[in-house]
Amino acid sequence: MTKEVQKSSMSKQTDNKQFWQRWASCYGPLMQSSEPLYAAIAQQMQPHLTPEMNVLELACGSGQLSFRLSRLVRDWEATDFSPKMIAQAKLKPRGAGLHFSVQDATSLPYADETFDAVLIANALHIMPRPEKALAEIYRVLKPGGQLFAPTFVHGEVPRTQLRMLAMRCAGLQIYNSWMVPQYLAFLQAGGFAVQEHALLGDTLAPLCYARAVPDKTRVTQR
């Protein structure tokens, strides 16, 4: 990658970081309207979480899924690249196994094969280089570990396009307007075998829930 492309990618990521910094204090209240969607994601995940698991969550926001699911596992490392989002999450009471920290999903500090599962919810589509995050997820997952990657996708109705336009007008950069087949192909190209997927949400904000495992027979995007 040229220095110019690297600089552009970092600039775009900074733009979205500034967006989340601005919205951190009111993000939790705003997400109350999305409670049914978070509940649906949690319902899909729960059968695959067990008490001995160590889980990494990327792009946790202020903990919408962290608090709900962390009680089901031994250790839950919830991370976000927005310091203000993490500060908001830390204001809430939490169990001993739930930890919050500021981390960059494309450059994680953890050793190889550390986690039994990784969750990244509603984030890959707003990353300028989501393949880097996917490569890091692949690296830190234990053999046989699981990736949970619910992500907003691009629907086929005009309302979806209006939603994305509204988000861009608010200052959030959307880099990948995947349809469901394109999103699943992206995960597969990154070295993951998709085990199941489901379309959640509504026609305004369709979300593709995907559960995948590392496919060690394939070459990942690095």
Which residues does each PLM region occupy?
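A short acidic, Gly/Pro-enriched loop at the edge of an enzyme's catalytic core
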Residues: 106-117
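Conserved class I S-adenosyl-L-methionine
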Residues: 2-50, 64, 68, 88, 148-170, ...
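Class I SAM-dependent methyltransferase SAM/SAH-binding core
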Residues: 56-107
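Core SAM-dependent methyltransferase catalytic element
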Residues: 190-192, 196-222
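A short SAM/SAH-binding and catalytic strip from SAM-dependent methyltransferases
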Residues: 117-129
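Short alpha-helix
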Residues: 175-190
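A short glycine-rich, Lys/Arg-flanked "PGG" loop and its adjoining helix->strand segment in the class I
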Residues: 131-143
